[in-house]
Structure formats: structure tokens, C-alpha cells
């Protein structure tokens, strides 16, 4: 079984992905981490972020062992990942990695921007998570402060809006809701409420009912 979760930055899809995977005993892949890992490799190597060939080369040498590196969550790496994720050659280079992960038993939960539309268009369950940008900025700011990083909520909001525009308007795999994805508005839900709503969606789809 494959569960695809898509949505904009800081919408809560990563947390939902982890919790759904734990609930069902599936493997979980935050596909945004893949792009962050590539971005960090480029930054560490002093590479120009506009060099698509270097980005593709870094992707082909990707070591999944670094996916848990806390440095990948920094604002600098996140901003760089947002830039390089628009490169079609890079996205193509990472497709097979993601699809192989999804295909391995017993099941998988993948979250990102194009899981239900490009990576796993035949996923058993598709959820599109949204949340008000102001709420997302507040969450992202609190996360940064919890890591001991300086964060200004107004700047974070501006960055989120800029990233939304870039994600939705890029030519390669833009952020969009798949026609058969179920919308989950996470604006006014705490973590437990969001998880319960997501589980309800999965169970409804598994039972053959389409939740509106």
C-alpha cells in the first residue's frame, strides 16, 4: 500500500507522514529531505546553486545515511533546496529512488510536493495537506526557535509565500492537488487532530468510500 501526501512548506505533511507510517507499520520518506541533502552537498562544496549539472551529480552520489542530519532542517539549506528542486533534470534523477522506496514492502508513506501527481500517480491513498500561510509561518518559527536558531516570523512568512509561488509555478512537477487526492486543511488542527483526520481519510479510501 502506498500513501502519498502532498502540500506546501510547513503545512504539517511531514509530521502526518511519520505518524501514518508508524500507525500502519509502513516505511516513511520525507522526499523534501532528499532535496535538502542535495542542497547541503552543493553548499558544503561551494557550488553555484544555479549549476544544474552539479546538482544532478550530487543527487547520483546521494547517501541516505545523512537524511537524519539536523543541519538539513536549517533555513539556509531549506531555501537552497527550494531553488534546486525546480530543476527538471534533478527531479528526474531522483524519481527512481523515490519510486523504488515506495515499491518496497510492506507499504510506504511518502510526503512531498509531487508524490500523488508524478512520483506515485497510482498511489492507493492521496492526501493534499494545506494550512493558512500565517499558521505555517508561526509553526516554522517555533520549530527554528526550538532548535536554538534565530527566527523572525515576518521573514519566515515572506519566505514561505515566496516558496509557495516558486513551487506552484515551476515548469517541472509543480505543486498541485491530484484530482483524486483528498484535501486536509490543517490550519486549525493540532498534531493529534491532524493525525486522526488523516487516518480517517485512509480508512475511508480503503473501505471504498470517497471522503469529500
UniProtKB/Swiss-Prot annotation:
Keywords: ATP-binding, Cytoplasm, Kinase, Nucleotide-binding, Transferase. It catalyses: CMP + ATP = CDP + ADP; dCMP + ATP = dCDP + ADP. Signal peptide: none annotated. It is found in: Cytoplasm. Coiled coil: none annotated. It comes from the Bacteria. One of its GO terms (biological process) is pyrimidine nucleotide metabolic process. Belongs to the cytidylate kinase family. Type 1 subfamily. This is Cytidylate kinase. It comes from Rhodopseudomonas palustris (strain BisB5). The gene is cmk.
